[in-house]
Regions:
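Active-site cores of enzymes that catalyze phosphoryl transfer or operate on phosphate-rich substrates
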Residues: 2-5, 10-15, 86-158, 163, ...
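N-terminal-proximal low-complexity accessory segments that begin disordered
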Residues: 3-44
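Short catalytic/ligand-binding loop motif for oxyanion handling, primarily in non-cytosolic enzymes
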Residues: 15-18, 66-72, 152-156, 192-196, ...
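Hydrophobic alpha-helical membrane-insertion signals
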Residues: 29-86
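A structural motif corresponding to the C-terminal end of an alpha-helix
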Residues: 42-57, 126-142, 176-178
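Short, solvent-exposed turn/loop segments enriched in Gly/Ser/Thr/Pro and often Arg
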Residues: 59-66, 148, 184-193
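CE4/NodB-like, metal-dependent polysaccharide N-deacetylase domain
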Residues: 162-187
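Hydrophobic, small-residue-rich alpha-helical packing segments that form membrane-like cores
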Residues: 190-206, 221-224, 235
Length: 286
């Protein structure tokens, strides 16, 4: 039987949102939700595997805007305030649903989830999740790659200087947070244009991630399609995403996030609860 290699490559990005002029800002919640629902759980899985002697060997892209937000003291404090309010709400929900076993089980699950997230964020990672990811990379458990400075769509940038700045600033930001130069880059939106490999080679990057059609409609077409890295003229390797696998974790129609057995996104205490009950947990604008 033929054997192959599987590369699990994750990409983490959020637009930069930081508004110190307001006590709270709705779009900052995107970061707080991602910390609780994605970044801390990822660290838990990676660290658990490493403790068991299993090196995950997962590649993880962390973009410069996300790295800056995760290491920002203001946003770190605001996340702690945010998750503390969620813990308080969950405690109230555990008491409110005491006579409804199914709902009570859900409330207890969320109470445990947010309590653990708060404890890990404050005590294990000292509010900076970057340190957790950096330690995993230094231990050889994962490899972290970079991205464009602002996640800008490179093919639509008309000036080579702008494209070069995106790549070079992405490299410098990576060095700032991870104390070494990156080997790879997730091209913003996986968007390729002819000649981008030369800019990547200038930055010392050895591989990049693109969408499948960049390879499948290339000239000449690689013999193995997207199922092997493609070496570009500048000597930088291109890895294409597998379409079917991507849909399983991304598509609302065929992937697991859109399946009600995974989660019911339209059931929300904000709609179910009385206004006076949920008011302390809403933004000040209601």
């Amino acid at each position: 039987m033929e054997q192959g290699l599987l590369s699990i490559i994750l990409h983490a990005h959020l637009p930069f949102v930081r508004h110190p002029e307001y006590p709270e800002f709705l779009e900052e919640d995107w970061l707080y939700e991602a910390i609780s629902e994605t970044y801390i759980p990822l660290l838990n899985v990676f660290e658990g595997l490493a403790v068991d002697g299993v090196m995950p060997r997962v590649t993880l892209g962390l973009t410069p805007p996300l790295c800056e937000m995760l290491s920002d003291p203001l946003l770190q404090q605001r996340y702690l305030d945010h998750v503390t309010k969620l813990v308080e709400l969950c405690e109230s929900e555990v008491m409110r649903t005491a006579k409804h076993p199914a709902m009570n089980e859900t409330a207890r699950m969320y109470l445990n989830h947010f309590s653990a997230a708060r404890d890990l964020f404050e005590n294990r990672y000292r509010r900076n999740l970057i340190s957790g990811f950096r330690a995993l990379q230094e231990a050889g458990a994962i490899e972290i790659i970079t991205c464009g400075a602002t996640h800008g769509f490179l093919p639509l940038m008309t000036r080579t200087e702008a494209r070069r700045a995106q790549v070079q600033v992405g490299r410098l930001n990576y060095i700032k947070h991870f104390n070494r130069a990156p080997r790879g880059i997730w091209l913003p939106e996986c968007a390729y244009y002819t000649g981008v490999d030369s800019l990547l080679e200038e930055a010392g990057l050895r591989f990049f991630i693109v969408d499948a059609h960049a390879i499948m409609f290339g000239t000449p077409q690689p013999r193995r399609g997207i199922y092997a890295p493609t070496l570009t003229p500048a000597g930088v390797a291109a890895f294409a995403r597998d379409v079917e696998t991507s849909e399983q974790v991304w598509s609302a129609d065929t992937g697991y996030p859109g399946d009600p057995d995974y989660r019911e996104f339209y059931r929300d205490l904000g709609f179910d609860g009385e206004y006076d009950y949920i008011k302390p947990y809403l933004h000040s604008d209601g």
